[in-house]
Design a protein with these regions (language model features):
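Bacterial Sec-dependent N-terminal signal peptides
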Residues: 1-25
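Residue-level recognition of well-ordered beta-strand positions that form the cores
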Residues: 27, 44, 97, 247-249, ...
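Gly/Pro-rich turn-and-neighbor structural signature
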Residues: 132-139, 249-251, 283-285
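Extended, loop-rich substrate-binding clefts of extracytoplasmic carbohydrate-active enzymes
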Residues: 194-278
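Short, exposed beta-strand/loop patches in secreted or surface proteins that constitute
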Residues: 65-73, 145, 152-154, 232-239
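Acidic (Asp/Glu-rich), glycine- and aromatic
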Residues: 269, 273-275, 280-297
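Alpha-mannosidase-like glycoside hydrolase catalytic domains involved in N-glycan trimming
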Residues: 21-126, 137, 142, 149
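Solvent-exposed N-terminal domain segments of exported/luminal and surface proteins
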Residues: 95, 100-226
C-alpha cells in the first residue's frame, strides 16, 4: 500500500489550466524519458462553482472517460478525474466542458466496489444481496461477522482489496490470475466452478498483522489497535467508473493505554483509500480533525 497526503503527485508531469466560462484546457506534460501509463489527472472543482452536474473531457476531439466525485456528501461535485497515458517527453492538451445541467455521463466501468450485509437466508457465499454504501456503529459494537467479506471491498482489473470492519481495520488482498473485474461475481469467496474457470481468491491470512498495511497507534513499544472509539464508520464514496474511493472514520479514538504523552485526548482519524483503474498501487490519505503533533502512529 502507498500512503500519500497530497491528492495527486505525478513525478515528471505538470499541468496548467486555462478557463473561460467553464471551458477548460488542461495541458499535461511528461518531462521524463519514459512513457507514463494510467496516470490519474484530478481537477479540484471548487473554483468553478457548486452547480456542476456533468463534465465532458476530450482529447484530440474525441471524448474520453471521466468521473465526477462528491467527496463530502453535500450534493456538490468536488473533483473531476480522468486517466492519461503519455509517451515519453510528450505534451497533451485535454478539453474539459463543465455543465450545470444533466447527469454525469456513463462509461464502461474499470473499477468496482461493494459493501454487503450478511443475509443468512442466502446460503451461497457469492450471491449475497443486502448491498449498503455506509455503516456507522457505536463503541463496543463489532459488525465484523455481520458484514459479508467483513467490510468494504474494491478492485480494478489488476488488484482487489477489502478492509476489515473492526478494531484492526486491516487491508486484505484478493489475488488474481488474470486481468478483469471479479468481485461482483465472486464476492471475495470463489466457488469451485469459478476456481476451475480461473477466477482469483482470498490469498492472505491477516489475523492481527498489518496485512497489506493499515494506520494504527504506537504506545512507545508496540502498535496499538483502534479498540476504543466513540463511533466507527466505513463507507464507499465512489463506485467508479475510473476510481473507487473507500473511507474509514474513527470518531473519538482513545488509545487503550489511557491519557499518556502520546494520546492525551480523543482524536478523530479519517483514512481514505483511492484505487484508480490500471494501477497496482492504492493511494491512502489520512486526515485528523485535531492537532496530532504529540501523537505517535
Amino acid at each position: 500500500m502507498k500512503r500519500k497526503i497530497a491528492t495527486i503527485a505525478l513525478c515528471g508531469l505538470s499541468c496548467c489550466v486555462l478557463m473561460a466560462q467553464k471551458q477548460l484546457d488542461i495541458t499535461v506534460k511528461n518531462t521524463m524519458k519514459t512513457e507514463r501509463t494510467a496516470q490519474p489527472i484530478v481537477i479540484n472543482l471548487a473554483p468553478y462553482g457548486t452547480d456542476i452536474r456533468q463534465a465532458i473531457v476530450k482529447m484530440n476531439g474525441q471524448e474520453i472517460a471521466s468521473q465526477l466525485d462528491d467527496l463530502n456528501g453535500d450534493g456538490c461535485y468536488d473533483e473531476l478525474c480522468f486517466i492519461a497515458d503519455m509517451a515519453k517527453k510528450s505534451t497533451t492538451t485535454y478539453n474539459v466542458e463543465l455543465l450545470n445541467s444533466g447527469k454525469p455521463r456513463t462509461y464502461k466501468p474499470l473499477v468496482y466496489a461493494d459493501m454487503i450485509l450478511l443475509n443468512k437466508k442466502v446460503k451461497s457465499n457469492n450471491e449475497q444481496n443486502l448491498f449498503i454504501s455506509s455503516l456507522t456503529v457505536e463503541n463496543g459494537t463489532n459488525p465484523y461477522w455481520q458484514m459479508h467479506h467483513h467490510g468494504p471491498a474494491f478492485e480494478n482489473e489488476l488488484v482487489a482489496y477489502r478492509i476489515y470492519f473492526d478494531h484492526r481495520q486491516t487491508v486484505d488482498l484478493y489475488g488474481k490470475y488474470r486481468k478483469g473485474l471479479e468481485l461482483k461475481e465472486t464476492q471475495f469467496y470463489t466457488n469451485k466452478q469459478q476456481k476451475e474457470a480461473g477466477y482469483g481468491d482470498d490469498v492472505l491470512w491477516v489475523g492481527n498483522t498489518f496485512g497489506l498495511g493499515t494506520m494504527r497507534g504506537w504506545d512507545g513499544q508496540q502498535p496499538t489497535l483502534l479498540e476504543d472509539v466513540d463511533h466507527r464508520t466505513e463507507r464507499i464514496i465512489s463506485y467508479g467508473p475510473l476510481r473507487t474511493i473507500v473511507e474509514v472514520v474513527d470518531d473519538g479514538w482513545k488509545d487503550k493505554t489511557g491519557n499518556n504523552a502520546f494520546h492525551p485526548y480523543p482524536i478523530t482519524m479519517t483514512t481514505r483509500y483511492t484505487l484508480y483503474a490500471g494501477r497496482r498501487d492504492c493511494q491512502v490519505d489520512v486526515f485528523f480533525r485535531q492537532a496530532v503533533a504529540n501523537h505517535q502512529f
